[in-house]
């Protein structure tokens, strides 16, 4: 199935895009009518035996899901099969959600409404239509859990299901990808795609052709993680900032030696700081040609690590290692690193042995990875707020699915204070007051440091709270399962993707009625996040499936989102006796600050996307070329044409019955090696360009246009250089000495490789200009 071309982001208003991002009532009504029509087939499905049910499913014609008359029968059969195999009978709203995913939408379905089952039904529909489905999760735990949970349903209707985690072997992966439905984390799917770019035999390929991606927690994967590069690295020696520079930067003064911007995204030396560094390094000129790409880069990297990256906010230190914290999930970002020496600089700052970065052999962003699929759909509890990005970058619509039972959660207005200190005092007092009643409380904080500070204050005030953050995320399922227990107070960092429902009365619901009488779970937010979605994810933990619940957020004018996006001089300052601001404008001001923050994030996404788009296009050309070399006689034919005398010499020297096959293998190895070598060198060149491209603005050049010009020119040379190098190797390689074979020492590949994710810095704000890629390979 061909894929609809995706256009570049426009400049239309947020409200306009968000409206476009939502599917129309007409579409929802059509799907609802099909759910209603399924009722006519329920008795018929219930009367079928298990084998008859499986056979009936196989007879359905779902090849054109948008115009199939068999959809109501499919819904009736899958509902019956689900109840028999899992004990779960899908509600109408779950069937509706599945249909909207089968229509290619991202659905918004509230926490606790059964997204996992709806996703399995949608996956079944695609698979029965002959499609291969990847259910993409945010971590390995959910991939395996959901595959094992939903597997009996899929198998009951004649489908095969598999799952992949980091521990899966190559054989496990090939078997799982061979199933009709495969559950895997976005990381593992991406790493398999990258690792396939090192194979030299087509039989060693693991990752299949991308067909359908059904994405759980779609906003987290498609928006929050969109620009995270997945990296395949090989062992090599790379320079990191010198220890003397890291130590020197640590001694600089914030008052005089360096400045940061208002939202702490950038830091730079002042003239005073530059002179101090130059003197300490022996009187050098940091901005001379000799040092601008070396010493100055080391200083800037060390400065970034020392000033902008804060322990227990951006990272934690555990088991003598630096672990990045995913800001949108509040968890350790597994396998994630900072690029270009920054990881080593942070490790040196913390007195930890620096780890190897290696040479980047291949890389792909999550956004480019997902855009490979012919069909993309998904589910999340907060899709509408991400509708703008889903529309712009993936051309996806959003379908809001009503809850099975109306939501009765009481969401109170924000309580706003002038200072963070006053806000924190009010939070502690509020939590102590609620705890006295026995009502369970879930507190959402914005980072690890804040969660631990609040936890300590609560303990001092006699409130027996538990804390869940990136430092103890291995225990999260147990903590969250008991967060609805009578008297429980749970302090947690961001709740996105926690994957465990909070049941009133605890995991066994023994105190359910008592907690219901108290008002259900009470959610407290310690401040607005940079996007409305994260606030809604936290609120959504209360009021599950019609349960009572409540939420309230505390904010202050000193909070990051407000301080960076509102003029403090124009904010109301009159307070009541408790220090709470008295003004009808507070909610509107907070909403405005959040919208500004969201707009900035969208700009960052769009601008970074414009750089990554070219790299993704170039990578696609490399992949096509590599696949041609792997699966055909292209390499042998090209080298025979380029070096006919050498080819004939080798053909005559080798046994006639094996000459062609032997030469095909040899030519393929040579061509693949030099193609891969050229691509790795090209990626290193692009990384170097990106480090200094912003300086082009000083010369009144467009950084983006310059990046495109340099990248396109270099890529055009890559093809010619790779083929020329392959020809030279073919003509000089030791092929005839001893047993016929290639001297592999001349084609040495990395002795070890590993995969990781890069927490990459956003690039400058530029306007996208038209670009074109030459047909660099024949």
From Swiss-Prot:
InterPro entries: Helicase_ATP-bd (IPR014001), Helicase_C-like (IPR001650), P-loop_NTPase (IPR027417), SecA (IPR000185), SecA_Actinobact-type (IPR026389), SecA_CS (IPR020937), SecA_DEAD (IPR011115), SecA_motor_DEAD (IPR014018). It is found in: Cell membrane; Cytoplasm. It comes from the Bacteria. It is a peripheral membrane protein. GO terms for biological process: intracellular protein transmembrane transport; protein import; protein targeting; protein transport by the Sec complex. One of its GO terms (cellular component) is plasma membrane. Its main location: membrane. GO terms for molecular function: ATP binding; protein-exporting ATPase activity. The keyword Membrane applies. Keywords: ATP-binding, Cell membrane, Cytoplasm, Membrane, Nucleotide-binding, Protein transport, Translocase, Translocation, Transport. It holds the Pfam family P-loop_SecA. PANTHER family: CHLOROPLAST PROTEIN-TRANSPORTING ATPASE, SECA INNER MEMBRANE COMPONENT OF SEC PROTEIN SECRETION SYSTEM. Monomer and homodimer. Part of the essential Sec protein translocation apparatus which comprises SecA, SecYEG and auxiliary proteins SecDF. Other proteins may also be involved. Belongs to the SecA family. This is Protein translocase subunit SecA 2. It comes from Mycobacterium leprae (strain TN). The gene is secA2.
